[in-house]
């Protein structure tokens, strides 16, 4: 949702630019992200968004705020599962984007949280990016001072992280 950065610098805006360069006029990107959103909020908003946009592909990158608030993994899983089901009922392909939470939440919780994404990807046979922030934590000036949100400098890498999985869906 471009937290703490100019929304024009966000990876979704970079995606729009890349798609327009590589496939002019073919794809329309609707960014429905909201800073601070939880899976519950996303689930409540999704039916109207599906009606409005009738997407061919739905990218679900949600749950980080749930995890940071310590929500039970089964609640997060159920909300994400319902979002996947709603999207698939509309014949949209789903790309599930995995998120990890900081290790200070404890091994048991962080493992259960991470397993939410991998188990859903397997159960629903989804395109899946296990860890969206791959190569971001290690890069210089890639994370904001909060240690949670990527900087504007990280946005091209985020797009590069998601692109291979997204491209597979775009080419179908």
Model-derived regions, located:
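Conserved donor sugar-nucleotide recognition element shared by glycan-biosynthetic enzymes
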Residues: 8-11, 38-42
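Short glycine-rich His-centered loop
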Residues: 1-4
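Short, solvent-exposed turn/loop segments enriched in Gly/Ser/Thr/Pro and often Arg
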Residues: 33-35
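Single-residue recognition of alpha-helix boundary sites
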Residues: 7-8, 109
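Alpha-helical cap/lid subdomain in secreted, periplasmic
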Residues: 14-21, 25, 30, 41-172
């Amino acid at each position: 949702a471009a937290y703490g950065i100019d929304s024009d610098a966000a990876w979704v805006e970079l995606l729009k630019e890349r798609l327009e360069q590589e496939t002019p006029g073919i794809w329309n990107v609707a960014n429905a992200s909201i800073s601070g959103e939880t899976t519950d909020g996303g689930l409540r908003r999704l039916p109207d968004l599906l009606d409005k946009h009738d997407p061919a592909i739905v990218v679900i990158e949600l749950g980080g705020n749930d995890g940071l608030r310590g929500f039970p993994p089964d609640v997060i899983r159920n909300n994400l599962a319902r979002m996947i089901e709603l999207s698939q009922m509309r014949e949209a392909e789903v790309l599930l984007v995995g998120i990890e939470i900081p290790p200070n939440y404890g091994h048991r919780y962080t493992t259960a949280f991470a397993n939410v994404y991998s188990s859903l990807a397997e159960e629903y046979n989804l395109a899946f990016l296990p860890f969206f922030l791959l190569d971001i934590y290690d890069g210089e000036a890639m994370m904001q001072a909060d240690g949670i949100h990527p900087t504007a400098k990280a946005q091209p890498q985020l797009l590069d992280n998601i692109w291979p999985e997204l491209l597979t869906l775009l080419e179908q």
